[in-house]
Swiss-Prot record:
Its EC number is 3.5.1.18. This is Succinyl-diaminopimelate desuccinylase. The gene is dapE. InterPro entries: ArgE/DapE_CS, Bact_exopeptidase_dim_dom, DapE_proteobac, Peptidase_M20, Peptidase_M20_dimer, Peptidase_M20A. Its cofactor is Zn(2+); Co(2+). It catalyses: N-succinyl-(2S,6S)-2,6-diaminopimelate + H2O = (2S,6S)-2,6-diaminopimelate + succinate. PROSITE patterns: ARGE_DAPE_CPG2_1, ARGE_DAPE_CPG2_2. It is an enzyme of class 3 (hydrolase). Gene3D superfamilies: 3.30.70.360, Zn peptidases. Zn(2+) 2 binds at residues 106, 141, 366. GO terms for molecular function: acetylornithine deacetylase activity; cobalt ion binding; succinyl-diaminopimelate desuccinylase activity; zinc ion binding.
């Protein structure tokens, strides 16, 4: 088979039911596209106690620098109610100019287009003056423990070094050419437990209601704002995601209350400085006796998620300029350079080389009837092909 057709590539990948953690044949299908192009393809299985084993793929064309890495994932989220789809989620049907299927935009479409772009570049110009690699995981939509982070470590231990990376996540809100991601906010999650004294609701003086205290502590995290934003990032934002007491009785004051929160933060902070700020706010609120006159300060515990992510911003001018000019050349749109949205595997790649993200329009990702315009697949392939040419030209300067 030839890999120059992004539509055929994507149909092949979608027909592999690779719902995390299942490989579903998707990495094998990708390998079949890359091997005829001259890539050396390797598979790596990552394991960790308490998590499913995950298959990953690393493929490289060339042995010299400069070295461009394309990164992404072939795993997809569950389809939900398959009967609600207008086309079977793994059939890759085309209707009304759109290709339907789970993973169409997130992100088998990006992989299909980059494979086609590389194939076209080789067909027209031969292999690039350097190296291109695919770093593809099967664990991005899941825990992300046995995926990109371990694949990077494995490859680096074998001597792999990269000069730049492009992640093919769907970055465009409305149309191709809208947005390139040049960084990501950091993320911290925490869990607060307030300890009270259980008692009868009619005799509050004999109890200590932790609900009042947990509300006060969470309010201290919400106001005042952590910052007003920076030149490249929107304001840091904390959301309380749950408050629980585990109490079904209306006449019982509970013994404890718990809350969870997540904060997406900008480059005003690091994980360490932000945790210190959160603790300072909680300590001040716990010591405030407004709601608990004459009592000891509120007793609380806090634990942190063991996998926070640091904020990062890519400042590699050659990488950003090569991609921006390629997008503008093909679409006529000047893309916005953005750091909005959630986290991605770029947070791991940033520790090895400069990284940017650009892919399809993300409006239907994770939804019933996930789909992509067939025309967008051709356009994205043209963007990627132009980017490859320009990046290697700029990297040689």
């Amino acid at each position: 088979m030839t890999a120059t057709d992004p539509v055929a590539n994507l149909q092949t990948l979608i027909r592999c039911a690779s719902v995390t953690p299942a490989e579903g044949g998707a990495l094998t299908a990708l390998a079949d596209m890359l091997l005829p192009l001259g890539f050396k393809v390797e598979r790596m299985t990552a394991s960790e106690a308490g998590t499913p084993d995950i298959e990953n793929l690393y493929a490289r064309l060339g042995t010299e620098g400069p070295h461009l890495m394309f990164a992404g994932h072939t795993d997809v989220v569950p389809v939900g109610d398959a009967a609600s789809w207008s086309h079977p989620p793994f059939a890759a049907d085309i209707a009304g100019g759109e290709l339907f299927g789970r993973g169409a935009v997130d992100m088998k479409g990006g992989i299909a287009c980059f494979a086609a772009a590389v194939a076209r570049h080789i067909e027209k110009h031969g292999p690039p003056a350097g190296s291109i690699s695919f770093l593809i995981t099967g664990d991005e939509e899941g825990p992300a423990i046995n995926g990109t982070v371990k694949l990077l470590q494995w490859a680096a231990e074998r001597g792999e070094q990269w000069d730049a990376s492009l992640v093919g996540e769907p970055t465009n809100p409305d149309q191709l050419g809208d947005m390139i991601k040049i960084g990501r906010r950091g993320s911290i999650s925490g869990f607060i437990t307030v300890h009270g004294v259980q008692g009868h609701a009619a005799y509050p003086h004999l109890a200590d209601n932790p609900v009042r205290s947990i509300v006060k502590l969470t309010e201290a995290l919400l106001d005042p704002p952590f910052d007003a934003g920076t030149d490249n990032f929107q304001p840091s934002n904390l959301e309380v995601t749950t408050i629980d007491v585990g109490n079904a009785a209306t006449n019982v004051i509970p013994a404890k209350a718990t809350a969870a929160f997540n904060i997406r933060f900008n480059d005003t902070w690091t994980v360490e400085t932000l945790r210190a700020e959160i603790l300072a706010r909680l300590d001040a609120a716990a010591a405030d006796q407004t709601l608990r006159p004459g009592r000891e300060p509120t007793k609380y515990d806090i634990t942190w998620s063991d996998r926070p992510s640091q904020v990062f911003l890519t400042r590699n001018n050659a990488l950003i300029a090569s991609l921006s000019s390629a997008v503008e050349n093909v679409t006529g749109h000047t893309p916005k350079l953005s750091t909005t949205g959630g986290t991605s595997d770029a947070r791991f790649i940033k520790d090895y080389c400069p990284v940017v993200e650009f892919g399809l329009v993300g409006q239907t990702m994770h939804m019933v009837d996930e789909r992509v315009a067939v025309a967008d697949l051709e356009t994205l392939t043209e963007i990627y092909e132009t980017f490859i040419q320009r990046w290697f030209a700029n990297a040689e300067l």
